Design a protein with these regions (language model features):
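Conserved N-terminal phosphate-binding loop of PLP-dependent enzymes in the Aspartate aminotransferase
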Residues: 4-445
């Protein structure tokens, strides 16, 4: 279906039948677990045939059935400039001809490291890795080694990758599939991670009272984006900084999503909080697999080869990802860049609220910068417990209705919508119109 055609299907799941996608997905299930390489892509939470993408350009996805979609997932937030930006494509192509992996240091790693440390004052040194999971896992190992303590505090519904430390009461795919904890994580290991509600300083204080002198770090998404978007309550981040300083524990900001998205200096520059360690990913690689963790020099120098805390990787700092990152970050420094994407995000949020009101449906729209979520619930969403009160069946129907109208949003109530520089005001208008039509259609059926 061309994205310019708005439809009002009686049966949106039938409308979203895609024979070529179905054929490839079924074929893939014979060799790929569940037919996918990341669970949320299987559409288990929303039903129907998963998208199988042929190519993408700007703010558009094109599936193997020839259908076109305005993309509000943006590779889960990584593509703030949109798909296949010509300058990034040119940089990657040029680098591919010069070598894709050296297994040794290149000047590109130094240059991107300098860009990041200049952008984020709390990050004095950085170590590149290949995924957000690896970065968060390594940051926690560093925190434990530096403080000589074992316990980590995390927040219910926050997602820090799929390492064993973080797979209890996590957001993202675990929330989507209703998994509270993953088998395969030994109880003894899971007991080293202490969960408490997001936006609840009393819960944090009580944990520190219960385990005095034993907590290595508190890790937090400064804006939660894996239980849907949930901004921090007034004083929450400031309180975490004060508590961790008092208790001589480290504060780790997981800015895999918010880094270089809320602002060039990340969420920490918006909220004016300096963490001890920062986890980054997505945007810094321009759509290629890359992540990083960084922080104060006195902490980072404990990592090998300067210190005894080991971490390594064959493809860490690979030149393709470094070139893509170096092609991306300067464009984010252009005056007005963030004001523009944030303005479009606010317009979309206002449009979603208007559509809910017109349809006489309960809903909450949370927005922070260029990421937002519409929750089908009648209570404010301030933490994971609030997010879980959302009507999952209604979200599934909404997702299918939007997809049938050429609008692709995340196939989970617990994920964010993302705005990129490639989205136009016309794209926002189309998404708002599709929302009005979808909610009206849901009321009729």
């Amino acid at each position: 279906m061309a994205s310019g055609t708005m439809r009002d299907p009686k049966n949106s799941r039938a409308e979203n039948t895609r024979p070529r996608s179905t054929e490839i997905f079924e074929r893939g299930k014979k060799t790929l677990v569940g037919g996918v390489n990341s669970p949320v892509r299987a559409f288990r939470a929303v039903g129907g045939t998963p998208l199988v993408i042929d190519y993408a350009k700007g703010a558009r996805l094109f599936d193997v059935d020839g259908r076109e979609y305005i993309d509000f997932v943006c590779s889960w937030g990584a593509l703030i400039l949109g798909h296949a930006h010509p300058d990034i494509v040119a940089a990657i192509s040029d680098q591919a001809a010069r070598g894709t992996s050296f297994g040794m240091t290149s000047p590109l790693e130094v240059e991107l490291g300098e860009k990041i440390t200049k952008a984020i004052p709390s990050v004095e040194m950085v170590r590149f890795v290949n995924s957000g999971t690896e970065a968060a896992m390594s940051a926690v190992r560093l925190a434990r080694g530096f403080t000589r303590r074992d316990l980590i505090v995390k927040f219910e519904g926050c997602y820090h990758g799929h390492s064993d430390s973080f797979l209890s009461e996590a957001g993202s795919g675990l929330a989507t599939l209703g998994i509270s904890a993953s088998p395969g994580v030994p109880d003894a290991f899971a007991s080293l991670t202490l969960n408490t509600p997001y936006n609840d300083l009393n819960g944090v204080e009580n944990i520190f009272k219960q385990y005095p002198g034993k907590i290595a770090a508190v890790i937090v998404e400064p804006v939660a984006a894996n239980m849907g978007v949930v901004p921090p309550a007034f004083g929450f981040l400031e309180g975490l900084r004060a508590i961790t300083k008092k208790e001589k524990s480290l504060l780790i900001f997981d800015e895999v999503i918010t880094g270089f998205r809320l602002a060039y200096g990340g969420a920490q520059s918006v909220f004016k909080i300096d963490p001890d360690l920062t986890v980054m990913g997505k945007i810094i690689g321009g759509g290629l697999p890359v992540a990083a963790y960084g922080g104060k020099r006195e902490i980072m120098e404990h990592i090998a080869p300067m210190g005894p805390i080991y971490q390594a990787g064959t493809l860490s700092g690979n030149p393709l990802a470094m070139r893509a990152g170096l092609a991306t970050l300067p464009k984010l420094e252009v005056p007005g860049f963030y004001e523009d994407v944030n303005r479009k995000s606010q317009r979309l949020a206002e449009g979603l609220r208007s559509a809910l009101k017109d349809a006489k449906l309960h809903g909450e729209v949370n927005v922070s910068g260029s990421l937002l979520t519409m929750f089908f619930t009648d209570v404010p969403v301030r933490n994971y417990a609030g997010a879980k009160k959302s009507n999952a069946a209604r979200f599934g129907a909404f997702f299918q209705n939007m997809l049938s109208r050429g609008i692709f949003i995340a196939p989970s109530q617990y994920e964010a919508l993302f705005i990129s520089a490639a989205h136009t005001d016309a794209d926002i208008d189309r998404a708002i119109a599709a929302t009005h039509e979808s909610l009206a259609s849901m009321q009729e059926h």
